[in-house]
């Protein structure tokens, strides 16, 4: 393999931790050998260089994370998951827990139940662009009732999550998804996750091109070993469509040393990637996908006639962090360069291989690509990617200002049909709303799309169907956007408790009461009902609902306790910062009332709350909050 870095390497950190004491560990590149004793039927694969840290400075062997060992010994994601799935136990062992993530599932327990482990599995689908065929939606709806908890969860990466599946039902559920034009392969795990793109079914050249590019990138980076089909449909590889030839060509191309030519995983090898990897594609100006939060952000560039001609590429975004570890941080992506449209798959592959070869595999807190770029700087990273790309990146093309698009309500597709964006609180589809949505989707044979804001788009609607669909949705409590509080329209929360093992407090179950309390504060301080701020809540610092881009972010840091983050902007182009730690749920008004009072009284015309907090500065805002605590009238 090319691109190895010789000698020792120091893993320092910059950015958010620049002013803080930072631990620096001496790292060195090593070669990870293939499994010494591959399972029957295993193929030998090329080695992947893992950038790791010795356990001690004088250690003779490099210590890799346990997940790296599990991947190495798994025979390309098969073993020991295949054995654990047929055992009588209701759960699977730790090695299998790590591997089943690659197949699109997490093992969970119900944390509301005390004194025993109630095991179940969450399944997550892979839906590039959020596209869901009619057949798949109806299948997921049925599976939720028969094998889940009776609800479907729409996610911030345009997928479904199905909670509460018992181990004994996993194969039935996954095989049903596969046989109904769906997949869960790569929805979790150390590889490329679901690829985002604008969810709206507009018949516009740039939107269609962004969606097609997202689907091609998803296909390029899909695991190839066949383990997924071996485990869930007994080796029958069910394809809904032939792979585009340009995808196959790009995957197989090894002219710049990107591939393991003798491996069933030519891009990933035995070790896959160091950590999760996220890609989004969008049209210029459309930031419905939170483009700067991804490992790779791809933006369609068009000529004066509106014809797509290439792409601007951003790299190094990511939300996850760890409380009290200041060397971990959320980060916005940097501009990498421009590529002609025919080169996009090769450029994407080169970036992925750079992360594969140079991302840290010793400490998973630092394994995301954002830390490599923060450590190296964008110029060094670009030079390394160009070795695998085989070309120089061109200069960024000018882009318009970003705008957030929710795609809610009735809109023209551009082909004579309509689409309707349904606002779904927290993305949780259940009860009468679930029943009504199924009836509409089934009756009118509609395809749907899932948005990155956890909402659902009904696609391809005839004009004559508009009135009966609007009436049916309203009767089920799915109101038109004009009838929903603006706070709710842009708010997001992760599922958190009771099933997520990482949650430190509530998110989904707590956000609606919090939004009502924010609206009450607005009313108290004289902010109009039509006004809003972007609120996002997560139960832990991993950032699944992207709270670090919110104007007002709540990040769980203990039972009924949150960090408060301020400074994101409505178009999701600015990173928020931590404003206050350990704010108890019962005390949030003590922080919000002085902040909103000060915003309402001193903001510039049309100034958003996020822009206001950035202009004012945290020192002044903390002074305002502290004075309010001493005497509200003095603030």
UniProtKB/Swiss-Prot annotation:
Any one cellular-component term (Gene Ontology): chloroplast nucleoid
Cofactor: siroheme; [4Fe-4S] cluster
Keyword Oxidoreductase included in the entry's annotation: yes
Any one Gene Ontology molecular-function term assigned to this protein's record: DNA binding
Targeting presequence: 1-50
UniProt KW Iron keyword: yes
First-level EC class: oxidoreductase
Outcome recorded upon mutating residue 193 to E: Loss of sulfite reductase activity, increased nitrite reductase activity and reduced siroheme redox potential
Result when mutating residue 276 to Q: Loss of sulfite reductase activity, no nitrite reductase activity
Residue ranges with Basic and acidic residues bias: 245-254
Tissues/organs with expression: Present in roots and leaves (at protein level). In leaves, sulfite reductase activity is detected in both bundle sheath and mesophyll cell types.
Pfam families noted in UniProt: NIR_SIR (PF01077), NIR_SIR_ferr (PF03460)
Cited Gene3D superfamilies: Sulfite Reductase Hemoprotein, domain 1, Sulfite Reductase Hemoprotein,Domain 2
GO biological process, one term: plastid chromosome packaging
Noted pH dependence of activity: Optimum pH is 7.5.
Homology family: Belongs to the nitrite and sulfite reductase 4Fe-4S domain family.
Oligomeric and partner information: Monomer. Interacts with ferredoxin.
Protein name: Sulfite reductase [ferredoxin], chloroplastic
Gene name of the record: SIR
